[in-house]
Amino acid sequence: KPRVTEPSRRTESVVVAAVNPRKNIEFYCLSVLIRKPDLVYRLDRKLEEFGLSPLATEDFEYTDHQLLFNVLRQAMGQDEKDHAQYVFSQIPEDLAPLVNELLAQTEKLESPDDKLLEDLLARFLDLRRFHAMSNVTQLKFMQDDEQQQGGENIKVYIEQTMRFTRLLNGLDQAKLKLSKRQA
């Protein structure tokens, strides 16, 4: 008699991954950065090479992830302690379970820093793309609503849509350059 519990578990995890890929990507990125906080500076430099802004709290959608990234950013801004040591000393108590999960995910992290850097860069570009696409979609709905109500503020929505469209272009160009480097 086949076991029913195994397939249902697999299906359940696939559904969770399909429902929220952004959370999984954020989780992975933080799991690497918590182990190797020095990669934050290197990621910032790479993003700037592509004409993009450095990593920011806004790159993360989830509050816990934002709080943890703020601790990482603070660690990079101080030079009294080793960056990793600083991070672990400043993590709020309520984030300890999240940090333990992150550390467990990357317990056997053995990739060279350059490979991790390229991987993280690609994932942060994806996160920014998800965010920008979501904003463009919302703005289009708002623009349609505004147009139906007389269109007094439509110019604002058009300008914001154009800004996110330019960002999407920049992200696509960066992703293309990155994929050429990896080839």
What do these predicted ranges mean?
Residues 11, 69-183:
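Bacterial replisome coupling helices
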